[in-house]
Amino acid sequence: VSHHKVVIIGTGPAGYTAALYTSRANLAPLVFEGAQPGGQLTITTEVENFPGFKQGIMGPALMDEMREQVLRFGTTIKSETVLKADLQSNPFRLTTDKGEYTADAVIIATGASAKWMGIGKDEVLSRSGGGVSACATCDGFFFRGKEIAVVGGGDTAVEEALFLTKFATKVHLIHRRDKLRASKAMQERALKNEKIQPEWNKVVEDVLTATHETPMGEKVEKIRALKLKDTVDGSHSELPVEGLFVAIGHQPNTSLFAGQLPMDETGYLKVEKGSSRTPIPGVFACGDVQDHVYRQAITAAGSGCMAAIDAERWLAEQGLAE
């Protein structure tokens, strides 16, 4: 079992900023990357709203810069996923897919993940290359010259739809209501774009597939149409598309802490107002895992800084900072 003063779980802007501050405070943090190193920004295109990059910067490039920066100050990064966290007594015990660790302080920066529609097939097809995705930036290119659909009505859905018009011949924007939740500027851009066809008051009931044979002779299921249900009159229709992008929100990655830390009804961690402290002394949370309101790269980074300073002060109070 290896012991560390500070362990940070997660490597988005929050985790990396927490690592930056704790490493500069000589606390030699250990960071676990988890299943999605770099977090949600690794599946976005250009980030144009992060201060200091007047031309914008690609999400993955921004995370690479942050990674290099924390390594420079002596952070240790391990590509391991935490499977179990015992926060009942200090030092806290963490079990990863590769070993056992203990820590005086834990900073939780596990972020949030894209939600699926709960019809089963969407998530399965996303893993098997069946034409379903939660990331337009990653997969948009594969749908050049095809007709596709985006499900959702918020900023993310509209942003994905607009981005996909670069590749697709037509983008059907499927929303369960008759108006979008996205910001006014986004809505105007989308509704002006002749490639975007809104499908109001519709939900996806099923993903219909056809079997294709790959050049290697393998059989794969690929999307051929969506079965839609009208939310007003209950009628059904079929929409032929070759791709589906799901953009219906996010789920905080907090199952690891169930029964140990308080969460709100949607699973976001609760922290003391104006700080990163959880009810367990020595355990701090930052980034999207505790923020369902702002969810921006810059606010995640800011809260990572808060968590690092809170952790540093707490360790000093306990006489554990030296």
Segments and roles (model prediction):
Residues 3-5, 79-80, 144-146, 201, ...:
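Phosphate-coordination loops involved in phosphoryl transfer and adenosine-cofactor binding
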Residues 113, 123-142, 246-294, 303-306, ...:
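FAD-site-proximal beta/loop scaffold in flavoenzymes
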Residues 70-96, 101-103, 165-273, 313-322:
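A Rossmann-like FAD-binding core segment of flavoenzymes
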Residues 4-73, 158-184, 264:
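Beta1-alpha1 glycine-rich phosphate/pyrophosphate-binding loop at the start
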